[in-house]
Amino acid sequence: ADGDYSEAIRLANEVIGSAEFGMEDTYADIFQHGYDSKELLVTRFMKNPPAMDDNVGSLFKMFGGGTYQPSSAYLAVFPEEDPRYEVTFDSLEFTNLNGEKYKRQIWKKHYVSTGDCPMYYMRVAQMYLIKAEAMLRTDSPVKDVVDVLNIVRNRAGATPLKASDYPDRESLMNEIFNENLREIGMENGALYYLAVRM
């Protein structure tokens, strides 16, 4: 049901407690293990596609066809000192048809040169983010919500958040949105629905 945040918490806990899935040891492991990642709940499987474009083509369309790159607003909530930054972004030099070279920032976590580029429609870390949002919306104590966010941040090697840094629930809701950007940004379209709920 719309706005059934208690049920969202229950379902998130069910997945988190399942022996079938689990968090990878590091953020990079998610993308290095690809289809074999224990963190993936839902993905599209196309192992060894006949041509790279069969799998990467849909990624290219979803992420701007190689035309778009992270905006300054996106990068403002994703500091370079966050260990996920290095896993998420890279800068490549391209040469156009006129022989001119230019650099473009790419979504490194999606690109695998072999063509085995899994789609991460939903993974375990997202369950923690959903749980944190639902807890905040059901008036759980700020410290409890921050503790859930820190499970994701600690695995990523990011600096833990402190409850005292959030003087009101709105500032913590903004942090939940930002943490979604950092953790699952450009993976599955979930940020759109989160933005609508905000």
Residue ranges and their predicted role:
Residues 1-57, 79-198:
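Acidic/polar-rich alpha-helix caps and helix-coil junctions
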Residues 62-75, 79, 84:
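Short, cationic low-complexity segments
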